[in-house]
Amino acid sequence: MLDKRKFYINGKWVSPSKPNDLEVINPSNEDPYAVISLGSKEDIDKAVKAAKTAFESWKKTSKEERLKLLEKLLEVYKKRFNEMAKAISDEMGAPMDWATEVQTGSGQAHLEDFILRLKEFNFDEHFDSKSSNHICYEPIGVCGLITPWNWPINQIALKVVPALATGCTMILKPSEIAPISGMLFAEMIDEAGFPAGVFNLINGDGAGV
């Protein structure tokens, strides 16, 4: 059984504040195949503190700096594509071909699209050549992101990647029913070299987190 009890907070895999195990079930055979921890308020507080601290420097990064990291993330995602497909197949009980082509493929497609959109996006937009007025787009701050079990990496990519692209920091809580793909994505974030605290992950249920 996979031991996935730790959370990703401030660039490190850390143990929860208090033990609270939950088995992850493969719906295709109804067998447990992994164990995670359900987080608490104390864990959330640690992640929020890390995200708030990281935001002060992350919000000042240039578009080019964020693009470089997202392109590295895409490279890592492609390298570990089959791992992601296997994680999704197990946690959803989904056929491997569907988990690969539709589920994991959508995550890659969203990453590629957001990279393209970021390249095209102007964060400082003038109204017209005759006016000195302009719109300056700024990151909003720390984002709390919750994703469902049925389109795990699809929804993670749709929420996490644009937040990263715009200079926000975040805490992700994937579905406790299908959390392994999210934890693998956290490993990819780490491997890509994002600064500590920019992305944090805590597992948990609705009542606790």
Predicted segment positions?
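Rossmann-like NAD(P) dinucleotide-binding subdomain of oxidoreductase/dehydrogenase enzymes
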Residues: 123-209
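N-terminal Rossmann-like NAD(P)+-binding subdomain of aldehyde/semialdehyde dehydrogenases
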Residues: 1-124, 128-131
